[in-house]
From Swiss-Prot:
Matches recorded under Pfam families: PRA-CH
Cofactor note: Binds 1 Mg(2+) ion per subunit. Binds 1 zinc ion per subunit.
Cofactors demanded by this protein: Mg(2+); Zn(2+)
Source organism, top-level taxon: Bacteria
The protein's assembly and partners: Homodimer.
Protein name in UniProt: Phosphoribosyl-AMP cyclohydrolase
SUPFAM superfamilies tied to this protein: HisI-like
Gene behind this protein: hisI
Length: 101
């Protein structure tokens, strides 16, 4: 099985190996998905810049892919990673650090 990219982008939920903490949500197009498989590092598609980006390329906070899980509809993916440094550009471990309730 492989992701269905018929709509162009799929959500990629990134979780930390071991803790299973949700680190971030980003989007992949087919090219980002293929580069992730090839390099075993996370690649995403930036909707604002309309280009590919490699997590940690400039910050050094890289993500090493341990496993990938495809959902039942083949239109979203969970990326299980070994995270180096914080995942969030703010310096927080995870992008999900604002508690609402």
């Amino acid at each position: 099985m492989k992701p269905n990219f018929s709509k162009g982008l799929i959500p990629a939920i990134v979780i930390e190996e071991g803790t299973k903490d949700v680190l971030m949500l980003a989007y992949m197009n087919e090219e980002a998905y293929k580069k992730t498989l090839e390099t075993k590092r996370t690649w995403f598609y930036s909707r604002s810049r309309q280009s590919l980006w490699n997590k940690g390329e400039t910050s050094g906070n890289v993500q090493y892919v341990q496993s990938l899980y495809l959902d039942c509809d083949q239109d979203s993916i969970v990326v299980n990673v070994k995270q180096v440094g914080p995942a969030c550009h703010t310096g927080e471990k995870t992008c999900f650090y604002y508690q609402i309730i």
